[in-house]
């Protein structure tokens, strides 16, 4: 299973992020390529506690949803609603300058995977408290999902 704990998997994500350009067209969804870069950065900020996000209401218990999203072999569905704080068209960080925003994302990815950690994992709005293993798997899956959205 791919995870950002694995250096090869992390390099794969970094290489694919480098292939994204401001004009890269989405295959589904509403985000632009630049908004996706900011969305991933906001996610990493949330994971590390630098961006506060309210818990999302749901009818499926967080532990069940967490297992389905992180450990089941099913691909993530398209169009799953994001929380407002991570939605660039609502309360997410607005895109500013593409290369600067991408550099920030790279820096956040490095900080996320650095050992020892200089932060504590924050609860996920849909999945609640998670282990480092789950966070690193989710981090890979989230980036992979959006990179597939843009065909890279």
Model-derived regions: residue spans:
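Short, contiguous alpha-helical
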Residues: 24-71, 118-152
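Conserved, structured core segments of small domains
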Residues: 25, 76, 80, 101, ...
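An N-terminal domain-cap segment
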Residues: 1-30
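Globin-like tetrapyrrole-binding proteins
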Residues: 4-7, 17-18, 84-96, 105, ...
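A short secondary-structure junction motif
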Residues: 20, 47, 112-116
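Short, helix-capping/interhelical loops that line the mouth of catalytic, cofactor-
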Residues: 49-100, 104
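N-terminus-centered regions that define maturation/targeting leaders and the start
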Residues: 17, 33, 40, 105-108
């Amino acid at each position: 299973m791919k995870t950002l704990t694995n250096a090869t998997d992390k390099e794969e994500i970094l290489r694919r992020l480098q292939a994204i350009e401001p004009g890269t067209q989405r295959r589904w969804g509403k985000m632009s390529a630049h908004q996706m870069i900011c969305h991933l950065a906001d996610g990493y900020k949330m994971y590390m506690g630098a961006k506060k996000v309210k818990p999302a209401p749901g009818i499926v218990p967080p532990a069940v949803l967490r297992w389905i999203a992180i450990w089941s072999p099913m691909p993530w569905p398209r169009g799953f609603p994001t929380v407002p704080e991570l939605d660039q068209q609502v309360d997410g960080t607005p895109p500013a300058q593409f290369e600067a925003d991408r550099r920030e994302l790279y820096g956040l990815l490095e900080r996320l995977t650095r050992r020892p950690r200089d932060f504590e994992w924050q609860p996920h709005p849909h999945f609640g408290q998670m282990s480092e293993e789950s966070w690193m798997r989710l981090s890979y899956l989230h980036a992979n999902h959006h990179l597939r959205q843009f065909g890279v």
